[in-house]
């Protein structure tokens, strides 16, 4: 299964193609992605982050083996071939254990890598950029690279032990700021300099040599950099190709390497395409997909209020608000301002902290209630036009069934379509 290496080879040969990575564990988002890839006959890259999924369960409660089982079961149920499915691990390193001494955090990171590789994840992002409890801030390139090389060695040994061959594909480096959208209001963003990118690569090459890992260098397919794209709660910093041109040209000197861009959510279709052309050819997307899910659910909740007596309604939006207020740990440190500003952010922020709450049993029950209420009889077309106008066009043309589930999935697929088009190449 060398989809990624082949994509990089084609890109380096001038095809201007790429691949997008779906970074979500939500079943409806994953179903939308699997069905979209199936319809377009493309491989599908699905990634779990070290926050979501780890050897202790992460915030989803899933280990890497659990996550793989969950995704593969869904793929099987949708007749999607498993050899077209690529699983990736994102920001794998001591990220979850920064409050521990480095020795302890890295021991946990070793086990994290083992658990991802043993579970069959093939795209491994090694990220040891974060300082642990007893580390200097920031870490030097050399320390970051030494730790990444240590984890690469663990990964290679684990892969050979479990699968009899070493066929992992690696991503190194990190973006600034932190994963998952910026906390503060942004106006402009520093693009990674070519010198900084070169220094990261050279430090890693040297560290890998010291670990006897020269042979895996061609399988290091991408470097994570900041091309100047980011979003905060209400704003998006759009890609400006001129500012990233020196960085873009620099990677042309490396035969088997492209860039990976994080936080590409909410970029325009034109910006996504230009990113791929400029060699930022792995595009990560996550919050934009759960944002689309949330949009569709809010629209369906509004339709429900028009059609169903108040006492029989699901009350999804109120249930969501009540649970978020009752358990504020996922949004409290991110959303600021007065009560109204925080209320709006909880519902509508681009950073989409609401995504952490969908698995809650009360919210899931309200979601199921909403779908039941709207599945009993056809949704009137004028209401679909009012609240889901993009889906209305497809319903009218006969290409989309106007059921709650299909409307949600299609709304998510509108975002996936932008990424697919950006990555198609010439």
From Swiss-Prot:
A Pfam family recorded for this sequence: GatZ_KbaZ-like
Function: Component of the tagatose-1,6-bisphosphate aldolase KbaYZ that is required for full activity and stability of the Y subunit. Could have a chaperone-like function for the proper and stable folding of KbaY. When expressed alone, KbaZ does not show any aldolase activity.
Pathway(s) annotated for this protein in UniProt: Carbohydrate metabolism; D-tagatose 6-phosphate degradation; D-glyceraldehyde 3-phosphate and glycerone phosphate from D-tagatose 6-phosphate: step 2/2
Leader sequence segment: none
GO CC entries: catalytic complex; plasma membrane
Biological process (GO), any one: carbohydrate metabolic process
Record note on quaternary structure: Forms a complex with KbaY.
One annotated GO molecular function: enzyme activator activity
Protein name: D-tagatose-1,6-bisphosphate aldolase subunit KbaZ
Record-annotated disulphide pairs: none
Species of provenance: Escherichia coli (strain K12)
Domain of life: Bacteria
Miscellaneous information on this protein: In contrast to E.coli strains C and EC3132, K-12 strains cannot grow on N-acetylgalactosamine and D-galactosamine, because they carry a deletion and thus lack active PTS systems specific for these compounds. Therefore, KbaYZ in K-12 strains is not involved in the degradation of these compounds.
Record family assignment: Belongs to the GatZ/KbaZ family. KbaZ subfamily.
């Amino acid at each position: 299964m060398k989809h990624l290496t082949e994509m990089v080879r084609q890109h380096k040969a001038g095809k201007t193609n790429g691949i997008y990575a779906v970074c979500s564990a939500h079943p409806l988002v994953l179903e939308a992605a699997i069905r979209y890839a199936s319809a377009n006959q493309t491989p599908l890259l699905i990634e779990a982050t070290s926050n979501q999924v780890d050897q202790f369960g992460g915030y989803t409660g899933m280990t890497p083996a659990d996550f793989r089982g969950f995704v593969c079961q869904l793929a099987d149920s949708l007749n999607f071939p498993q050899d077209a499915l690529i699983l990736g691990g994102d920001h794998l390193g001591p990220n979850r254990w920064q409050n521990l001494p480095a020795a302890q955090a890295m021991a946990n990171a070793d086990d994290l890598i083992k658990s991802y590789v043993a579970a069959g994840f093939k795209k491994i992002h090694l990220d040891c950029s974060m300082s642990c409890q007893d580390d200097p801030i920031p870490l030097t390139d050399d320390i970051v690279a030494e730790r990444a090389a240590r984890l690469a060695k663990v990964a290679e040994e684990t892969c050979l032990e479990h699968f009899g061959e070493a066929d992992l594909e690696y991503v190194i480096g990190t973006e600034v700021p932190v994963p998952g959208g910026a906390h503060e209001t942004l106006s402009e963003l520093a693009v990674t300099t070519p010198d900084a990118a070169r220094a990261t690569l050279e430090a890693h090459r040297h560290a890998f040599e010291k670990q006897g890992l020269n042979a895996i260098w061609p399988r290091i397919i991408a470097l994570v950099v900041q091309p100047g794209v980011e979003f905060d709660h209400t704003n998006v910093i759009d890609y400006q190709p001129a500012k990233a041109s020196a960085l873009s040209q620099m990677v042309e000197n490396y035969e088997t390497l492209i860039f990976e861009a994080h936080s590409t959510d909410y970029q325009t279709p034109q910006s996504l395409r230009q990113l791929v052309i400029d060699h930022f050819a792995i595009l990560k997307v996550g919050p934009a997909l759960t944002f689309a899910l949330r949009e569709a659910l809010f629209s369906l909740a509004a339709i429900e209020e028009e059609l169903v007596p108040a006492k029989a309604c699901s009350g999804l939006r109120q249930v969501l608000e009540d649970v978020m207020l009752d358990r504020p740990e996922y949004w409290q440190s991110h959303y600021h301002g007065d009560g109204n500003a925080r209320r709006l952010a909880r519902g509508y922020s681009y950073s989409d902290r609401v995504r952490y709450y969908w698995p809650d049993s009360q919210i899931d029950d309200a979601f199921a209630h909403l779908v039941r209420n709207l599945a009993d009889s056809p949704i009137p077309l004028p209401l679909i036009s009012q609240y889901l106008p993009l889906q209305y066009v497809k319903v009218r043309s006969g290409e989309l069934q106007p059921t709650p589930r299909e409307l949600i999935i299609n709304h998510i697929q509108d975002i996936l379509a932008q990424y697919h088009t950006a990555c198609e190449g010439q």
